[in-house]
Amino acid sequence: MKKGIVRNILSVKYDSYKSEYWVFFGQSKNESRIIVYNKKWQKLKIIGENHFNFRAISSVFFKNHVLWFMNNPNGNSFVIKYDRDSELLQKGFEFPGPVWYSFSSDNRYFL
């Protein structure tokens, strides 16, 4: 990544289904992005960039899809569903503001 592209790494999550790291970046809309890396930290792909859809801190991984929770400082945030096969995005539930943290326990998920 070029110097000066982003100021903040919001979170780094390990995807145990694919053995990859998902890195969530963003301070401003233009700095927001999700990039996937392998275990050697080589960039595999950019899921999306330059939109608050790709500014998140919390995410949950499943076999066929990935969910993340937008952290939009300027408006409403949504659950975003990424389909692994088609690479399509789908907006889900709308939150009244940014989502900061989530955790899972015994296949239950909490925001």
What are these regions (language model features)?
Residues 18-23, 64-67, 108-111:
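Entry beta-strands of beta-propeller and related beta-repeat scaffolds
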Residues 6-11, 51-63, 93-109:
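Repeated scaffold domains used in trafficking and secretory/extracellular systems
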Residues 1-2, 39-53, 81-100:
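Trp- and S/T/G-rich repeat-edge/linker motifs of beta-rich repeat architectures
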Residues 17-18, 28-29, 39-41, 64, ...:
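Short strand-connecting beta-turns/loops that link adjacent beta-strands
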Residues 29-36, 74-82:
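Structural motif
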Residues 23-27, 69-72:
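Recurrent small/Gly-Pro-centered beta-turn motifs in extracellular repeat architectures
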Residues 1, 9, 31-32:
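Short N-terminal edge-element motif at the start of the domain
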Residues 19, 29-32, 51-54:
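Beta-propeller domains
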